[in-house]
Amino acid sequence: MVAAIAAVVAVAALIVALTNARPAATPSVPTYTAAQTAAAQRQLCDTYKLVARAVHFDTNGNNPAFARIALTNAAAMLDSVETDPALDGRHRDAARALAAAYRTLTAKSSSDAFAEVEYRAALGDVNAKEAAMNEVCADGG
């Protein structure tokens, strides 16, 4: 008899729990104002313009060490600004792709470790990613 009462109480508790169940609250996605997004884009593009000048100057010189340093610093600087949560996906993706291309070119610029064709492919990828970055930053941000 006690087991039957316990079973009825358990079933009743289950019915109450199921009928009162509420869907889990979905986490809110932060939203940013147009001004915040524009500021993040401007910061990224200002950083890109700075690193592009350094990369252009140092990779066209006669010191491979300076070229590698410029590429590595450029990738790190782009990484630091592309993490701004107010930055839109188009700008973030372009910055991430360019930073990765800079790192790959740095690695493949060692003439003893990679063939010329691999270096040229990495250089071509940098040029393509820079063109994409120029496009997203064409209007100042």
What residue spans do the PLM features occupy?
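Extracellularly exposed regions in secreted/surface proteins, prominently low-complexity, repeat-rich
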Residues: 110, 114-141
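Hydrophobic single-pass membrane-targeting/anchoring helices
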Residues: 1-27
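Alpha-helical segments in soluble extracytoplasmic regions
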Residues: 32-93, 106, 125-127, 131-134
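Active-site proximal helix/loop that lines the substrate pocket
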Residues: 103
